[in-house]
A protein has these predicted regions:
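Hydrophobic faces of well-ordered beta-strands that scaffold small-molecule active sites
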Residues: 1, 27-31, 69-73, 122-126, ...
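N-terminal substrate-binding region of glycoside hydrolase catalytic domains
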Residues: 1-57, 61-68, 76-102, 198, ...
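Acidic-and-aromatic substrate-binding clefts and catalytic sites of carbohydrate-active enzymes
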Residues: 2-13, 37-53, 131-134, 172-181, ...
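Short, acidic/polar
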Residues: 4-23, 55, 103-113, 177-189, ...
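A structural motif corresponding to the C-terminal end of an alpha-helix
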Residues: 23-25, 58-69, 109-121, 153-166, ...
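Active-site cleft segment of glycoside hydrolase catalytic domains centered on the general acid/base Glu
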Residues: 50-54, 80-194, 207-216
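Aromatic-lined glycan-binding groove of carbohydrate-active enzymes
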Residues: 189-199, 208-254, 293
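Substrate-binding cleft of secreted/luminal carbohydrate-active enzymes
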Residues: 204, 226-238, 249-297
């Protein structure tokens, strides 16, 4: 965003984003890592081009401001989420055993390079929103043997570099308790131990706050893990942003959420509603045993 000329302001005063965040008590940032976010001709895919070099620059800025880092391995060259988990270009054609080794080697090598650069993360999540698996099709749900194999390879690699670095496994849809129980029951039978269950929670998609709370409590009690809301946000307006986007009608992607979904929210899409929602999220984390923090996304 900064490379495109964006500037950050606090009450009308321009400032460095990390200065502003620190002044408001932010103590940790979540940085994603893509394997090779470029075309075969070397053209960046965009969206921040979050390769290892970008990670090191951002992590240094955050750490210089006293913040910890949650490193988010996607194990993909671009976005990985429940709707897509593409194998990195360099790993295409590998079988499950080869992918397992590739995950281990890549995770270990990148962490060692981060360590040498003085930007080793304080927390690592092995995969991003793994609800439907990772590195499809071999690691696509319901291939739980391979899912556990790939995730466990990443966990072992983290432990080999920093045995005290907590490891997170992150799913989406934080209000869906049956899905979490099913996923983690399968994983626990097969996979390496880990430390934290990460959840995504967007209120227009992922159920009510009460459903989120019930799931957090059950996960902490059932599996004995800390709980982090790894992604959470709430809008403050339904105003059309066409004037800011400056794209033609055929190029616009539209709202992040639909007006019909907003109608069912317990909070209005206003600055006051956004603040109330986030205050309730923070209170929930404080109240739930094992609640350990959140990352606004």
């Amino acid at each position: 965003v900064e490379e495109l000329g964006a500037k950050y302001y606090d009450n009308g005063v321009q400032g460095d984003i990390f200065d502003i965040l620190k002044n408001y008590g932010v103590n940790s940032v979540r940085l994603r890592l893509w394997n090779d976010p470029y075309t075969e001709d070397g053209v960046p895919y965009g969206a921040g081009t979050n390769d290892l070099e970008v990670y090191k620059k951002l992590a240094k800025r955050a750490m210089d401001h006293g913040m910890s880092i949650l490193l988010d391995y996607h194990y993909s060259d671009f976005w990985a989420d429940p709707g897509k988990q593409r194998v990195p270009k360099a790993w295409r054609g590998m079988d499950a055993d080869q992918l397992e080794q590739a995950v281990y080697d890549y995770t270990r090598e990148t962490l060692l390079e981060m360590k040498d650069a003085g930007v080793l993360p304080q927390l690592v999540q092995v995969g991003n929103e793994l609800t439907n698996g990772l590195m499809w099709p071999l690691g696509q749900k319901p291939e739980y043997d391979n899912i556990a194999k790939f995730v466990s390879a990443g966990i072992r690699a983290v432990r080999s570099v920093g045995s005290d670095i907590p490891v997170m496994i992150h799913l989406d849809n934080g209000g869906n308790n049956p899905m979490y129980v099913d996923w983690f029951d399968h994983y626990m039978e097969r996979g390496e131990n880990f430390d934290i269950i990460g959840m995504s929670y967007y209120p227009f998609w992922h159920g009510t706050m009460k459903e989120l709370e019930a799931n957090m409590r059950d996960m902490a009690d059932r599996y004995g893990k800390k709980i982090v809301i790894a992604e959470v946000s709430m809008g403050f307006t339904m105003e059309d942003y066409a004037d800011y986007e400056k794209l033609g009608p055929d190029d616009r992607k539209g709202y992040a959420t639909k007006p019909s979904l907003v109608e069912n929210l317990d909070y209005p899409m206003t600055p006051e509603g956004q603040a109330e929602f986030m205050n309730d999220i923070m209170k929930l984390i404080d109240d739930v045993p094992g609640g350990d923090g959140f990352y606004y996304w």
